[in-house]
Every structure is written in C-alpha cells, then in structure tokens.
From Swiss-Prot:
Family per similarity comment: Belongs to the class-II aminoacyl-tRNA synthetase family. Phe-tRNA synthetase alpha subunit type 1 subfamily.
One MF term in the entry's GO annotations: ATP binding
Cofactors that this protein relies on: Mg(2+)
Name of the protein this chain belongs to: Phenylalanine--tRNA ligase alpha subunit
Record note on quaternary structure: Tetramer of two alpha and two beta subunits.
One GO CC annotation: cytoplasm
Co-factor note (free text): Binds 2 magnesium ions per tetramer.
Residues binding Mg(2+), per UniProt: 262
Amino acid sequence: MSLIDQLNQLEYEALAALEQIADLTALAEWKSAYLGKQGALSRLSRGLGALPAEERPVAGARFNAARATLEQALERAEAQLKRIARQHAFEADQVDVTLPGRAPAVGRLHPTTQMLRTIYGILGEMGFQVWESPEVETDEFNFQLLNMPPDHPARDMWDTFYVETAPGEPTLLLRTHTSPGQIYAMRANAPNPVRAILPGKCYRYEQVTARHEMQFYQVEGIAIGEQISFSDLKGTLVAFAERLYGKGVKTRFRPSYFPFTEPSVEFDIECFLCGGAGCRVCKQSGWLEILGAGMIHPVVLRNGGYDPDTVSGFAFGMGPERMAMLRYGIDDIRWFFSGDERFLQQF
C-alpha cells in the first residue's frame, strides 16, 4: 500500500473515530492519538523522506490537506461538545420550582432591644406613652431643672462627658440619665395629666467593669396628675415586676436619695438564684435592685410647668441591660456591647 493510500486510510479512520467521541476528555485523547507530536499522522509523515523526489510534492500536499481536514473536524467537534457541556451544566443548575423552598436565616433582636420592647409593652398597657429626648443635653436640662444647681453635691453622683462649645454658648454634655426627658414631657403636656416613659442611651465617664459601662440604656417613667400618691407608685412598680419576673415575685422598697424625687426609694426583687438566702450575685443580701423611684420633687414639677400645690406625680428609672441580666442570669454587662455572636444567638 502506497504512502498516500495509507494516508487516505488514516484520514478515514480518524474521522470515523471522531464521530464516536462523546465528551471533551475523549476528544483530547483523539487529538493526541492522531494530531499529536507522536500521533499517527506524524509517524506516517516520516515516510516522506523515502519517496522518490518527484513524488514528494504530491505526497506532501496530501499530508497537509489531511492535517487541515482533521484539524477542522476537531474544531467543529470541540465546539459542539462545549455547547453540549454548557447545556448540561445549565440544566444541572436549574431550580426545580416544585421543590419546597429554603427558609431564609432569621435574625435576632439584641437582648437590650428585646427588653426595651417588653418594658414598652407592659407600661404601655398601663397607659404610658413613649417619648424621646436629646442625647446631647444642656447643663440646664441635665442638672439645673432637676433640682441640681451649679456646685450642688448631688452632681458628683454622675461622672459626666462634657462637649466643647464656643465661649458664651450653653454648656453641652452627653446626658448622664434620661431624667432630663421629664422636663420635655411635662412642658409638652402641662397642666394636663401625663404618663410617659423616656427610653434612650446614657453616658458616664466610668471604669468599664462587669457591672458598669460608659454607655448604657435607661428608661425613665413619670406619671403626673391630681392626687397621685406613693401608693400609686408602689402599685405600678409591683405590677410591673410581676409582669416581668412572674406572679408572686417578692419585692421591697428601701429609702434612698435622688435630688429630683422626694421621698426617694430603691425597688428590689428577691434574688432569683438563691431565693433570698444570700449568694454572690445578690452580695449575700437576698435582694436584687432593679430600679430607683420616688415622688417628683416640687421644684422639678414647677420647672416642668406644673403647680405642685395642685398636682403631684411619681418618677422611676430603670436600666434595661441590668434587668435583662437579672432575667437571663447574665453576669457581665460588657456582653451587651461585645457584638459576640455566641452571646447574641442565645436570645
């Protein structure tokens, strides 16, 4: 068989084999077997040197034509197989709309936000409305209108962040409590009765410990009207504690001092860990403080636009983080501001 006959036979076999190729891996093997450096076409071309000189041009042209034919066939087959592979990939990625959907990941509210909403719900059912007041406050509203004139010793109860202001401008500070909101709520409602809660962030220049943070939330509450007495304050706080910590929770009131209330009290609940026996959490007292309260001082009522001779009122202030700590047994307030997912995902 002449070299050209062998070439014709090789071309026929190669094209026939190409028609049987079903994937790109087999196509690569076909290319190596027929068109590679050690492939069948290259091995056959080595016989060109043994031909008579007059036959070499014809045989060389035939070799070039055969190579071109096989390469063109290879390109067509490769393009077709790639289209098929893309189609298979597309079909594999298609979503079966008849299958049940995947539920999206559900986020969680921060435990402070959860406690705030619980407080809103309980006090809202008692007729209290939510008010907001500025976080950057004047010295007048943060101290003076709350019965703490300049140089009053009660100011030492709070370590204050002051804001730089131009000479002659009012002294500005980051509010140390939400009590300034009392004045805003009073002046907006006087001389009419009012029940309001004033939640928000407070700031104090304190060392950060397991019990203290420089930034924290507080909820202030006031109720003003005719013939409001300490009994109303007591009934409100006891009902609030029972809603938050469970029916039958033991409570007590202790005398205290706040410049904007008179008389002033601390409101405690029985320690839920030791049942009143005394433990590390309650400092062996058997009780846990949850808020401060009292009857609004006549000076504060007057500064809010009310006549203390005709109306009276009570006020209370609580820390949502502290109340959440008591409710969930959290021993370090710094967790609330850590952003640690291990902590937040528990709520």
